Amino acid sequence: MVKPIPDHLHTVTPRLAVPGADAIDFYARAFGAEQIRDVFSGPDGELIHVEIRIGDSVVMLTGESDMARAPGGGPVTAIMATYWEDVDAAWERAVAAGAEVIYPLEDQFYGERGGRLRDPFGHQWMLSKVIEEVSL
């Protein structure tokens, strides 16, 4: 019987538009990503689909196209929220790989240590770790 949701995916799985399959290398260096599916390319070599795993989560990548554009001049439409056992090490690795700091990694009033980065493809990533339980 065919499963409507593949075992390795969840009800919501992010799919990021990137310039090409070379993005896999950045995500491997920045976040320890592993490629878990072969690259599916179109007739002209453009990236159609690939899947990577970061920690326990799958992220799909697709090539940039007119169908995968944010509204001109509008705010970002999504931010990747990630949690790490060692957020400081994850942060340093991502910055060393070329991620741009949007706001620095620091202890937050809501009980997390976190900050926000932008990858070379324009996607924003929050890196966090819960450091204390706080009632909000």
Task: State what each model feature region is.
Residues 1-17, 24-120, 127-136:
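Vicinal oxygen chelate
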